[in-house]
Amino acid sequence: MYDMKALYEATSVQNAIELRLAHPEAQIIAGGTDVLVQMREGKRAGKELISIQGLDEIRGICLDENEAIRIGSLTTFSHITRNPIIQKYINVLGEAVDMVGGPQIRNIGTIGGNTCNGVTSADSASTLHAWDAIVEITGPEGVRRLPIHDFYIKAGKVDLRPGELQTAIIIPKEAYEGYHGHYIKYAMRNAMDIATTGCSVNVKLSEDKKTIKDVRIAYGVAGPVPMRAPSAEAKAKGKPLTKAVVH
């Protein structure tokens, strides 16, 4: 049993916004893999909850008219890992979220929840920073988009204003085309553990594959929010692809 004051079930994004405005202290819940655990521990006891789990309009992955990859905020980790668009263009994200918890968590946990909780150790967080992701937010005043590095404000806090809801994460075509990368997770255990630190790197090579044309390096748990490593990126850009440069 969970100690909650009330549970409201949103029927649409607009209805979720209306519920948020009517109940400003309520907690949004989707998969519930974080919120319900916190409630069980008494940290959110007596809270009102707004469930958005039934909103299929913000679930799924597609390429938009500009060939940007659009990931609905209710898309689960398992769906992301298996999705052919992810596998073809940004498989590093699929690999990263496949390291979250166990199969049960990945089957119900969502990319939106993983980013909206503002936790720097989230496996998706550093990976999305390395993809120059854009966060789409829908609220009373319409839709706004901002770079993911601006979405994270401080530890446990993201840029969601009263009545707003994260509805998608977008990877622009120019952010993924020609890039390849890897995500490395360090943790106390090999599985079922949060990251002690996480590092995601995406590299774009020259046509002859001998020079680093561009690189993005992002870390989780290196600070209160996920962060890029601009000095390391600048040092590597334009350099030959050698062990000396990589190390």
Question: Predicted regions span which residues?
Answer:
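C-terminal structural segment of proteins
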Residues: M1-H247
